[in-house]
Amino acid sequence: MYRDPEAASPGAPSRDVLLVSAIITVSLSVTVVLCGLCHWCQRKLGKRYKNSLETVGTPDSGRGRSEKKAIKLPAGGKAVNTAPVPGQTPHDESDRRTEPRSSVSDLVNSLTSEMLMLSPGSEEDEAHEGCSRENLGRIQFSVGYNFQESTLTVKIMKAQELPAKDFSGTSDPFVKIYLLPDKKHKLETKVKRKNLNPHWNETFLFEGFPYEKVVQRILYLQVLDYDRFSRNDPIGEVSIPLNKVDLTQMQTFWKDLKPCSDGSGSRGELLLSLCYNPSANSIIVNIIKARNLKAMDIGGTSDPYVKVWLMYKDKRVEKKKTVTMKRNLNPIFNESFAFDIPTEKLRETTIIITVMDKDKLSRNDVIGKIYLSWKSGPGEVKHWKDMIARPRQPVAQWHQLKA
């Protein structure tokens, strides 16, 4: 009798089972890998998309180097800079950084109502407009119109009491000048290195500009802290509708700087306490909680944690960090960190608090920072002085996160 050898083989069924099991295992492995890649791509694309809404992708124009600069408006309406500086070259592309654009574009829509006729300010007379949460300093400038030459003149004179943006306790300020709603063309002052009370005394001319068009514009000044290695930090802004200014002669103004409308104010706040023990030569930093943190992920949330750096004479000494709070824009940390700081080194010490968004598959994102020292911004300096004035007592204070 003839028998099929395959049917008679007792090992055949077991080989089929093994083959099917291997196929299923490989399929599941490929599926897991593909899901992981899709999640990573969605997270990266979400962050890039959000960042593209906040920053301009084109480099800044070269930094100004002359005492008088001009934008000439020919018949075609295209603005060109007609005042190159002899013997000087523009900054390299590597020194140019993008700025938040919503600070300019959002402002166009917010200044169409509640306009009052403006009168020149003086050193003593600048009124404090509204209740500002933080002193950002003030700026002095003048503006006027030459009817014979159809030229608007803007002179940036000086600023006072600017906040420190660098951990060294100072800033490198410069000013951008726009005539809104035109956001494409701008002029800039020089950068004043390490100066919280800079003097510019630079004059800017908008030439070939008919008066009937000038009065339809808004003069917008944005003060920024120049940063060679990252995005320039907004310090504050001033805006004046030119139809509310007597332009027949140069008018000089002192104006308080207001927070820039660039989204930096929506980064959230952090509550922390400082406790100074002079006998133990130590400071205890307690990271308590945060609120209204900026969402950094595509799902509208963040995975925040906090880094604490101890700096001495602008050099990093020691780092501590909290645990990561998953998908939480109002996290509660309640973590304390002790740092050894001799009393004689206290004046040269800075504590940098950085709130980060954790990302497993790419670089972690900075949500915002706080610089604590005796020479930081007004709110930070107050906290630092209160800590020293009340030794061995935890002194808690809310801080606005900054870019």
UniProtKB/Swiss-Prot annotation:
This is Synaptotagmin-7. One of its GO terms (molecular function) is syntaxin binding. Its cofactor is Ca(2+). Residues 90-100 have a biased composition (Basic and acidic residues). The chain crosses the membrane at residues 17-37. Keywords: Calcium, Calmodulin-binding, Cell membrane, Cell projection, Cytoplasmic vesicle, Exocytosis, Lipoprotein, Lysosome, Membrane, Metal-binding, Palmitate, Peroxisome, Phosphoprotein, Repeat, Synapse, Transmembrane, Transmembrane helix. It is found in: Cell membrane; Presynaptic cell membrane; Cytoplasmic vesicle, Secretory vesicle, Synaptic vesicle membrane; Lysosome membrane. Belongs to the synaptotagmin family. Binds 3 Ca(2+) ions per C2 domain. It comes from Homo sapiens.
